[in-house]
């Protein structure tokens, strides 16, 4: 008993000593985490070189665009063919993908041989043979009458220029078909099919096996965005942001990059990591100096590395008593499967003995222990190197997405990963150690090269179908120049109807006289109060206007809220509250009891009979104070002042915010004769000739007309421009059938139009994987500010996704592109419609004055104009295009509703004083 324990102890110690000896000898092959992180850092740099246009030509890691722009989302369906050519045999497959709530993939395939004479013959012979095999397969399945989409896995070095265009760089794997290198493989296969003439197919996609692996796994797990192969060769691909791929035009979305990482180190980057054994393998290979990383990690070289180490150690008399057999001295005799078997057996030492005996050796126990340990070190290094480069890829994706913690899946294929007993586990553990801030799942690919090609095709088909469907839906929102000219013409007609006494009553564009008959001339001076009431908050302002050398405007203001019970109470309560706030402001400014001229910006629909008389037609914006509609708001304000008996005010002018905007800008620019607001709502005003304002007596001079153009189209004159989405937004609004033009182009409604389009797309499976969230059903979630943010040029798609997530909408990268596209189309139409309306206004001014050309400035205010990244530019371009005889400048207003009311009051006081003199 004691003897057997002693013997076991002796062997354990012996083994331990031998392992230590090998570990010491192969010290440089055992890589610390510190070294692996350094390799990872170097690989990141190489990736960046491959992506950048300037360094791509000399980069060793080529980072080739694959033109695969999306991974599966699980809604793919249809029948597809796949060709898989990567060796002496090739396969034809029929892949049926169903999506009836249960994702299912059915495959039938047949393997065909490629005879040596065809591999070495002409390209025509090779592709005729492939087309013949394809015909045979389709015959058997009786599908020759169908024109099916086909994906082609072509595992040879290619330069891809489109998804369905791929130029062969050079043959490998024993192929030498003449006249193929440098040519597009897809064209060659198409021509071969045409020569036959007995069937037709639609070649949609050319992919390599790594991409196919990612796509296969992507169908089962939508987080899969990396493909990895570790077999006879090694490579990886991943989904990169388009904005970083300099070699392809476009910044939107993502594209799969075929890294060709086997060439990492070809420029000397890994020279300090490579050992003498790596150098020896390279020198004896078919392609010295190339694919150096692959030679350190892939199955083609793993067994050979072990053999070279054994030979060197034997020559140094560290193994086999210094003796070597001819078999062990023969390249390729120690295979990678031997490495797997030695490491896989419970008694790996015994397996090592069997392999060594097969190779004509007579090993001792120590030799077998050493061989087992060498296999472990070589395969562990392979897994570690693989993990280092994968860590770089994961870190890059994480940074691209701007996420604190990345959740991602890696689709993996290849004999080393699948068949080596410990490779997968070692790789996974090392990756998780190197990138602890990533949650990584490894998914084994089942038939990546066949099913994957079909999946790329299925995704391309889905994207193409969805793109066509979306284009068709968005088409009515894209207005041609002719359509915009027609909108301009109709606006002019409606303006004439609003000005005419005869048609005014039935005209939707009311063209209301404002009794503002002059713009500022710069001589205005004095202190004025201004009230600005247009929502749940209102402002009281003191505006000091100076002329002469100190010309300018100085403002002080205070904001007060209007509680809901007052908004919904009586008119007396509302105006008493307003007067209370004025009293508070005067006390705050140290002006208690002072009587000043007052301008009142009152942004509700009114009929104005004088500058200081304005009849409220109806409350909007949530106000419901009783006893106000049909009453003069100036009288209501004066009565409230008298009730308080604390101060008196001279109410000189009631104005709306559009006129205030024109006057504010008119103070800065004497050419300003038009006011425009494009914010939550939209309206315009302009200086009209008095002779055309039939509702007011007098022919001389000009008067500002408040167009109230938001109601353009309320008589049905825009029905042919209204889409189903405009109709839906109108029907669910607080005022159906009213303000139709405003509902097509103002900030309050653009988000709702977008939301309705997104719901339509989702219902039809074109967006959000066909899943409508409760959040998307919620009216009003798409505020104008989100549209502005989403369309911002400096915003990456990840940030668009973040905005959508904030709105409770889980989206993919593709979804983000679509949402951005919808926002762009809706906002562009809004800007163009606004431009068409403005073109009608400035052209009318020009024609009124009988001018060939008009120079005019438009004062503009409103969040949509000021904050949206493209609205202003598109609108200005539209005006320029539709009113070419007008030289129109746009001046942004600063506080039109407050400062503007004071300036109207100042102008009125100036004119009144001049009249008194």
Curated annotation (Swiss-Prot):
Superkingdom in the source lineage: Eukaryota
Residues at which D-glucose 6-phosphate 1 binds: 84-88, 209, 413-415, 449
Binding site for D-glucose 1: 155-156, 172-173, 208-209, 235, 260, 291-294
Annotated residues for binding of D-glucose 6-phosphate 2: 532-536, 657, 680, 861-863, 897
Any one cellular-component term (Gene Ontology): mitochondrial outer membrane
A Pfam family: Hexokinase_2
PROSITE patterns linked: HEXOKINASE_1 (PS00378), HEXOKINASE_2 (PS51748)
Mitochondrial-binding peptide (MBP) as annotated region, ranges: 1-16
Keywords in alphabetical order: Acetylation, Allosteric enzyme, ATP-binding, Cytoplasm, Glycolysis, Kinase, Membrane, Mitochondrion, Mitochondrion outer membrane, Nucleotide-binding, Repeat, Transferase
This enzyme's EC code(s): 2.7.1.1
Reaction(s) this enzyme catalyzes, per UniProt: a D-hexose + ATP = a D-hexose 6-phosphate + ADP + H(+); D-fructose + ATP = D-fructose 6-phosphate + ADP + H(+); D-glucose + ATP = D-glucose 6-phosphate + ADP + H(+)
Positions of region (Hexokinase small subdomain 1): 73-207
CDD domains linked to this entry: ASKHA_NBD_HK2_meta_rpt2
Residue sites binding ATP 1 per the record: 30, 84-89, 425-426
GO biological process: apoptotic mitochondrial changes; canonical glycolysis; cellular response to leukemia inhibitory factor; establishment of protein localization to mitochondrion; fructose 6-phosphate metabolic process; glucose 6-phosphate metabolic process; glucose metabolic process; glycolytic process
Topology in membrane: Peripheral membrane protein
Pathway: Carbohydrate metabolism; hexose metabolism; Carbohydrate degradation; glycolysis; D-glyceraldehyde 3-phosphate and glycerone phosphate from D-glucose: step 1/4
Region Hexokinase large subdomain 1, residue ranges: 208-447
Residue ranges of the region described as Hexokinase large subdomain 2: 656-895
Subcellular location(s) of the protein: Mitochondrion outer membrane; Cytoplasm, Cytosol
Notes on the domains: The N- and C-terminal halves of the protein contain a hexokinase domain. In contrast to hexokinase-1 and -3 (HK1 and HK3, respectively), both hexokinase domains display catalytic activity. The region connecting the two hexokinase domains is required for the catalytic activity of the N-terminal hexokinase domain. The N-terminal half regulates stability of the whole enzyme.
Assembly and binders: Monomer. Interacts with TIGAR; the interaction increases hexokinase activity in a hypoxia- and HIF1A-dependent manner.
Entry similarity comment: Belongs to the hexokinase family.
Biological function: Catalyzes the phosphorylation of hexose, such as D-glucose and D-fructose, to hexose 6-phosphate (D-glucose 6-phosphate and D-fructose 6-phosphate, respectively). Mediates the initial step of glycolysis by catalyzing phosphorylation of D-glucose to D-glucose 6-phosphate. Plays a key role in maintaining the integrity of the outer mitochondrial membrane by preventing the release of apoptogenic molecules from the intermembrane space and subsequent apoptosis.
PANTHER family: HEXOKINASE, HEXOKINASE-2
Protein name as annotated: Hexokinase-2
UniProt lineage: Eukaryota, Metazoa, Chordata, Craniata, Vertebrata
Gene encoding the protein: HK2
